[in-house]
Amino acid sequence: LNPTYGTVTLGQPLEAASILNRLQAIAKVPLLNTADFEAGVGFRIAGATQFPRLMAFGAARDERLAEEAGRITGEEARALGVHVNFAPVVDVNNNPRNPVINTRSYGEDPEMVGRLASAYIRGLESAGVAATLKHFPGHGDTDVDSHLGLPIIKHPRSRLDQMELVPFRAGIAAGADAVMTAH
Protein backbone atom coordinates (compact mmCIF):
# COMPACT_ATOMS: atom_id res chain seq x y z
CA LEU A 1 0.00 0.00 0.00
CA ASN A 2 1.52 3.30 -1.10
CA PRO A 3 1.60 5.80 1.81
CA THR A 4 -0.41 8.39 -0.12
CA TYR A 5 -2.63 6.27 -2.30
CA GLY A 6 -4.04 2.80 -2.12
CA THR A 7 -6.76 0.82 -3.70
CA VAL A 8 -8.50 -2.20 -2.33
CA THR A 9 -11.05 -4.31 -4.10
CA LEU A 10 -13.88 -4.64 -1.62
CA GLY A 11 -15.96 -7.81 -1.80
CA GLN A 12 -18.69 -8.49 0.75
CA PRO A 13 -19.51 -5.94 3.50
CA LEU A 14 -17.82 -7.91 6.32
CA GLU A 15 -14.72 -8.47 4.21
CA ALA A 16 -14.58 -4.79 3.22
CA ALA A 17 -14.92 -3.59 6.82
CA SER A 18 -12.28 -6.07 7.96
CA ILE A 19 -9.80 -4.94 5.30
CA LEU A 20 -10.33 -1.26 6.03
CA ASN A 21 -10.06 -1.84 9.80
CA ARG A 22 -6.79 -3.77 9.36
CA LEU A 23 -5.35 -1.06 7.11
CA GLN A 24 -6.39 1.60 9.63
CA ALA A 25 -4.72 -0.38 12.44
CA ILE A 26 -1.36 -0.65 10.66
CA ALA A 27 -1.29 2.88 9.26
CA LYS A 28 1.17 5.27 10.88
CA VAL A 29 -1.30 8.11 10.36
CA PRO A 30 -5.10 7.78 10.22
CA LEU A 31 -6.35 6.82 6.78
CA LEU A 32 -9.02 8.81 4.98
CA ASN A 33 -10.98 6.10 3.17
CA THR A 34 -12.91 7.08 0.07
CA ALA A 35 -15.24 5.19 -2.23
CA ASP A 36 -17.45 5.68 -5.25
CA PHE A 37 -20.91 4.76 -4.01
CA GLU A 38 -22.99 6.74 -6.57
CA ALA A 39 -25.94 4.38 -6.33
CA GLY A 40 -25.46 3.17 -2.77
CA VAL A 41 -22.80 1.01 -1.18
CA GLY A 42 -24.18 -1.95 -3.14
CA PHE A 43 -22.99 -0.14 -6.28
CA ARG A 44 -19.52 -1.50 -5.40
CA ILE A 45 -20.03 -4.04 -2.62
CA ALA A 46 -22.19 -7.13 -3.04
CA GLY A 47 -24.78 -7.56 -0.33
CA ALA A 48 -25.09 -3.87 0.56
CA THR A 49 -27.96 -1.58 -0.44
CA GLN A 50 -27.98 -0.61 -4.10
CA PHE A 51 -30.29 2.13 -5.30
CA PRO A 52 -31.43 2.85 -8.84
CA ARG A 53 -29.33 5.35 -10.77
CA LEU A 54 -29.95 9.01 -9.97
CA MET A 55 -32.23 9.51 -12.97
CA ALA A 56 -34.86 7.43 -11.13
CA PHE A 57 -34.76 9.91 -8.23
CA GLY A 58 -35.03 12.72 -10.76
CA ALA A 59 -38.13 11.11 -12.27
CA ALA A 60 -39.70 10.90 -8.80
CA ARG A 61 -38.69 14.52 -8.03
CA ASP A 62 -38.82 13.62 -4.34
CA GLU A 63 -36.21 15.27 -2.13
CA ARG A 64 -37.21 13.05 0.79
CA LEU A 65 -36.24 9.93 -1.19
CA ALA A 66 -32.92 11.47 -2.24
CA GLU A 67 -32.14 12.40 1.37
CA GLU A 68 -33.04 8.90 2.57
CA ALA A 69 -30.78 7.35 -0.08
CA GLY A 70 -27.97 9.60 1.12
CA ARG A 71 -28.56 8.66 4.75
CA ILE A 72 -28.62 4.92 4.08
CA THR A 73 -25.53 5.16 1.87
CA GLY A 74 -23.77 7.16 4.57
CA GLU A 75 -24.67 4.75 7.36
CA GLU A 76 -23.47 1.75 5.36
CA ALA A 77 -20.30 3.56 4.25
CA ARG A 78 -19.43 4.53 7.84
CA ALA A 79 -20.05 0.97 9.01
CA LEU A 80 -17.40 -0.14 6.50
CA GLY A 81 -14.96 2.58 7.54
CA VAL A 82 -15.43 4.85 4.52
CA HIS A 83 -15.23 8.58 5.29
CA VAL A 84 -15.78 10.21 1.88
CA ASN A 85 -18.20 9.22 -0.87
CA PHE A 86 -17.44 10.30 -4.43
CA ALA A 87 -21.08 11.31 -4.91
CA PRO A 88 -23.45 12.81 -5.83
CA VAL A 89 -23.15 13.31 -9.57
CA VAL A 90 -24.38 16.86 -10.19
CA ASP A 91 -23.93 16.93 -13.95
CA VAL A 92 -26.98 18.18 -15.83
CA ASN A 93 -28.09 15.57 -18.37
CA ASN A 94 -28.68 17.93 -21.28
CA ASN A 95 -26.91 16.26 -24.20
CA PRO A 96 -28.48 13.09 -25.65
CA ARG A 97 -25.13 12.24 -27.30
CA ASN A 98 -23.38 11.99 -23.92
CA PRO A 99 -22.16 8.39 -23.61
CA VAL A 100 -21.47 8.31 -19.88
CA ILE A 101 -23.62 10.66 -17.75
CA ASN A 102 -27.23 9.94 -18.80
CA THR A 103 -28.78 7.82 -15.99
CA ARG A 104 -26.04 8.88 -13.56
CA SER A 105 -27.63 12.36 -13.49
CA TYR A 106 -30.75 13.45 -11.62
CA GLY A 107 -31.97 15.00 -14.88
CA GLU A 108 -31.96 17.87 -17.33
CA ASP A 109 -33.23 20.66 -15.06
CA PRO A 110 -30.29 22.28 -13.22
CA GLU A 111 -32.47 23.57 -10.37
CA MET A 112 -33.95 20.11 -9.77
CA VAL A 113 -30.51 18.49 -9.94
CA GLY A 114 -29.35 20.98 -7.31
CA ARG A 115 -32.33 20.33 -5.02
CA LEU A 116 -32.03 16.54 -5.17
CA ALA A 117 -28.25 16.63 -4.78
CA SER A 118 -28.61 18.93 -1.77
CA ALA A 119 -31.08 16.53 -0.17
CA TYR A 120 -28.73 13.60 -0.82
CA ILE A 121 -25.84 15.56 0.73
CA ARG A 122 -27.89 16.28 3.86
CA GLY A 123 -28.64 12.58 4.24
CA LEU A 124 -25.08 11.44 3.56
CA GLU A 125 -23.55 13.96 5.93
CA SER A 126 -26.12 13.22 8.67
CA ALA A 127 -24.44 9.81 8.80
CA GLY A 128 -20.98 11.38 9.10
CA VAL A 129 -19.78 10.80 5.54
CA ALA A 130 -18.40 13.63 3.41
CA ALA A 131 -19.99 14.32 0.02
CA THR A 132 -18.13 14.99 -3.23
CA LEU A 133 -19.81 16.89 -6.06
CA LYS A 134 -18.78 15.68 -9.50
CA HIS A 135 -17.75 16.31 -12.34
CA PHE A 136 -16.72 20.00 -12.25
CA PRO A 137 -17.33 22.13 -14.28
CA GLY A 138 -19.98 19.80 -15.65
CA HIS A 139 -19.86 16.73 -17.86
CA GLY A 140 -23.49 16.57 -18.97
CA ASP A 141 -23.27 18.60 -22.16
CA THR A 142 -20.36 16.71 -23.68
CA ASP A 143 -20.22 13.89 -26.19
CA VAL A 144 -17.04 12.16 -25.01
CA ASP A 145 -16.62 9.63 -22.20
CA SER A 146 -14.00 11.19 -19.91
CA HIS A 147 -12.61 7.73 -19.20
CA LEU A 148 -11.66 7.50 -22.88
CA GLY A 149 -11.01 11.07 -24.03
CA LEU A 150 -11.12 14.75 -23.10
CA PRO A 151 -14.67 16.13 -22.92
CA ILE A 152 -15.04 19.81 -23.71
CA ILE A 153 -17.96 22.09 -22.88
CA LYS A 154 -18.15 24.56 -25.75
CA HIS A 155 -20.26 27.23 -24.10
CA PRO A 156 -19.42 30.69 -22.74
CA ARG A 157 -19.13 31.30 -19.00
CA SER A 158 -22.58 32.92 -18.94
CA ARG A 159 -24.13 29.63 -20.10
CA LEU A 160 -22.12 27.65 -17.51
CA ASP A 161 -23.50 29.97 -14.81
CA GLN A 162 -27.08 29.32 -15.97
CA MET A 163 -26.81 25.55 -16.46
CA GLU A 164 -23.77 23.49 -15.43
CA LEU A 165 -22.74 25.43 -12.32
CA VAL A 166 -26.23 25.72 -10.77
CA PRO A 167 -26.14 22.28 -9.08
CA PHE A 168 -22.55 22.80 -7.90
CA ARG A 169 -23.55 26.03 -6.17
CA ALA A 170 -26.55 24.31 -4.56
CA GLY A 171 -24.41 21.40 -3.40
CA ILE A 172 -21.79 23.69 -1.90
CA ALA A 173 -24.52 25.64 -0.11
CA ALA A 174 -25.86 22.32 1.23
CA GLY A 175 -22.46 21.56 2.77
CA ALA A 176 -20.65 19.34 0.27
CA ASP A 177 -17.07 18.85 1.43
CA ALA A 178 -15.32 18.30 -1.90
CA VAL A 179 -15.61 18.83 -5.63
CA MET A 180 -14.19 16.34 -8.11
CA THR A 181 -13.00 17.83 -11.37
CA ALA A 182 -13.95 16.22 -14.64
CA HIS A 183 -11.32 13.69 -15.56
Region spans (language model):
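N-terminal beta-rich core of secreted/periplasmic extracellular enzymes
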Residues: L1-H135, L165, R169, A173
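Binuclear metal-dependent hydrolase catalytic cores centered on His/Asp/Glu-rich metal-binding motifs
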Residues: V144-Q162
